[in-house]
């Protein structure tokens, strides 16, 4: 029996060698155009090099950047990056270094404390964003009357309010102020600020605006003053929203990048929840309640302001500036071993050297913006990020986040009960964001979106139809709240975390700041449009019409995502260059001609048609072979029991 297992293992090993030889040959034989990846292959820039070529290139890199004293470490790191499944065969690796690489697969959440501290600070920045949104939610019930712009159709004495329609528009514009300023100014300031001050400096500047502007809103005496302070808040929100997801994405390892970067939405949801708590806490303070509701949003900005400089700067930003020594120091703080830091330093350098082929010369801000639409690889990322950001507004989440108190009052709730119902919405939104930590890197960004959008459509439709129940019925308010909560439960693990995570990772480093600015500006511009129009829409179409309208937009968003949003899970930021080099026409053709028919065969006609054929592969391996590579890698780092199990599976496969 033992002899049979040994012979079987030898056969598997020989076949793995043959497969590996084909893998290397495919990598070296095919030229690659980063703007037109017609072969749909994702390539490791080191895989086609011989060991001697890698060593020679690393030595030249070390000499050029002052790393002569750590050349052996860089060589080991480059050889590990060259062939990740075979890292055990690299000469000179210590047991500690091997354990560090193993744990990337077996214990991917074992990361340095400073990485988690950085993500916590970024999460606080997200909470600021959420709290800023809900301050106006509660204040909507009282600030119009306090500032002389009453929105009711009739005054308490029964006389008609002739300015009601005008004041509804003013209320919408004031609520939209931060999003108008973010979309047209704040987001676009992030590129020059990032260029001169780095990621941390930009976050600091934005935190100053986010700390002071809510205080200005709280002391405003006229609606004009309130509008100006809301515009100033938007400057900080735009810079922060464009920078923090990038900062998280650039610091996180690929295996958990999605889960860490999605903390932006999870903690935005937490900020929304805290904002609803603050609205409830101050509701009985009389005439100043709306001032406290606006002003409380400055509280989470203070720890962000003080803590950001305790985080390491983005190593990719340092590399972009040619500051490799500082990049390595940052990576040492963000990785478990110096080997992993050296490996990532050289691998990022190698990928960015290829990425530099996008632009052969240094470009200014305006040129980079134009290139979002003219360079094919960047244009595809621009389209995908635009789609997911637009979808966040099409789904209708912000009609609840901005106006839930108003919506529940129209459903027959008292002011206190409306604030309590809004608090429940904030709690559900936050609680159901947690599953995305585990699912976003397992099922993927695209899969989560395609599953949750149909669910959001029917829950919004149901919520709207529940307004047709007579208001005297006890079921009226309860069912409206139930379906709004179900809507939030489906939104939170899908369209909630994905847009900012996705947009932060899809652009090449050369265009990452301006690309993220574009994505966030898209999101906030349409949030402004929604905020301005919804009060009037609610008045003209009734809650039933407004909710049904947004239910239909969910279906539109589903179709756009299906056609234009590729999957990005578990790829390094640099490997995404190859995914977005696939022509849009080919991607759409694959979705319509392959994926859609497969889905109908599998789930409608219930036929056993196997796995859906993949569009891209990794260096010559088709999708099933990608699983095969991961199986080999896991077998090289797993305990003996798992290794024997994997060898048996591979033997059966061959």
Regions found by a protein language model. Name each.
Residues 2-332, 353-654:
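Alpha-helical transmembrane bundle of multi-pass membrane proteins
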Residues 334-344, 350, 357:
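Short intracellular "coupling" helices and adjacent cytoplasmic loop segments at the cytosolic face
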């Amino acid at each position: 029996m033992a002899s049979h297992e040994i012979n079987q293992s030898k056969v598997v090993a020989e076949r793995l060698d043959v497969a590996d030889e084909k893998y290397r040959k495919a990598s070296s034989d095919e030229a690659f155009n980063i703007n037109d990846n017609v072969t749909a292959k994702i390539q490791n820039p080191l895989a086609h090099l011989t060991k001697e070529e890698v060593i020679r290139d690393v030595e030249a890199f070390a000499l050029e950047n002052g790393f002569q004293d750590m050349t052996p470490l860089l060589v080991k790191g480059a050889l590990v990056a060259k062939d990740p499944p075979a890292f055990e065969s690299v000469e000179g690796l210590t047991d500690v270094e091997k354990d560090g690489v193993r744990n990337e697969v077996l214990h991917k959440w074992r990361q340095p404390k400073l990485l988690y501290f950085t993500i916590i600070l970024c999460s606080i920045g997200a909470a600021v964003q959420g709290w800023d949104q809900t301050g106006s939610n509660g204040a909507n019930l009282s600030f119009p009357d306090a500032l002389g712009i009453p929105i009711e159709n009739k005054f308490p004495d029964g006389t008609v309010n002739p300015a009601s329609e005008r004041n509804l528009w003013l209320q919408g514009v004031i609520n939209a102020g931060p999003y108008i300023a973010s979309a047209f100014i704040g987001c676009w300031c992030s590129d020059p600020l990032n260029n001169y001050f780095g990621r941390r400096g930009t976050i600091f500047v934005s935190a100053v605006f986010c700390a002071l502007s809510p205080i200005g809103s709280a002391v405003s005496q006229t609606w004009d003053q309130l509008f100006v302070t809301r515009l100033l808040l938007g400057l900080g929100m735009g810079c922060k929203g464009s920078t923090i997801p990038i900062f998280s994405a650039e610091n996180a390892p690929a295996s958990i990048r999605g889960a860490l970067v999605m903390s932006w939405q999870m903690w935005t949801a937490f900020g929304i929840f805290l904002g609803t708590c603050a609205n409830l806490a101050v509701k009985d303070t009389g005439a100043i309640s709306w001032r406290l509701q606006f002003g409380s949003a400055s509280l989470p900005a203070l720890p962000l302001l003080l803590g950001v400089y305790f985080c390491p700067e983005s190593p990719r930003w340092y590399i972009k500036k040619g500051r490799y020594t500082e990049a390595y120091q940052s990576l040492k703080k963000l990785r478990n071993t110096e080997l992993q830091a050296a490996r990532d330093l050289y691998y990022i350098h190698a990928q960015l050297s290829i990425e530099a082929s996008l632009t052969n010369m240094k470009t200014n801000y305006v040129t980079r913006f134009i290139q979002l639409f003219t360079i094919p690889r960047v244009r595809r990322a621009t389209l995908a990020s635009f789609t997911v950001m637009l979808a966040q507004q099409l789904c209708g989440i912000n009609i609840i986040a901005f106006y839930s108190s108003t919506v529940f009052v129209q459903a027959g709730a008292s002011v206190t009960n409306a604030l309590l119902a809004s608090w429940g919405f904030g709690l559900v939104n936050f609680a159901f964001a947690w599953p995305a930590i585990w699912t976003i890197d397992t099922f993927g960004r695209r899969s989560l979106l395609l599953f949750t959008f149909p669910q959001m459509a029917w829950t919004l439709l149901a919520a709207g139809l529940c307004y047709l129940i007579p208001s005297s019925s006890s079921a009226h308010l309860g069912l409206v709240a139930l379906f709004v909560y179900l809507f939030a439960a489906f939104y939170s693990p899908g369209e909630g975390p994905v847009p900012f995570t996705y947009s932060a990772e899809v652009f090449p480093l050369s265009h990452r700041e301006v690309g993220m600015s574009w994505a966030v500006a898209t999101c906030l511009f349409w949030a402004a449009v929604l905020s301005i129009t919804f009060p009037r829409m609610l008045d003209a179409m009734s809650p039933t019409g407004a909710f049904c309208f947004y239910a239909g937009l969910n279906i539109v968003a589903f179709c756009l995502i299906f056609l234009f949003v590729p999957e990005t899970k578990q790829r390094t930021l640099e490997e995404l260059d190859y995914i977005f080099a696939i022509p849009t026409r080919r991607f759409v053709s694959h979705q319509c001609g392959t994926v859609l028919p497969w889905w109908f065969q599998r789930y409608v006609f219930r036929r056993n048609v196997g796995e859906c054929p993949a569009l891209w592969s990794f260096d010559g391996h088709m999708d099933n072979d990608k699983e095969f590579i991961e199986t080999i890698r896991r077998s090289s780092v797993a305990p003996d029991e798992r290794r024997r199990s994997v060898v048996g599976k591979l033997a059966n496969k061959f």
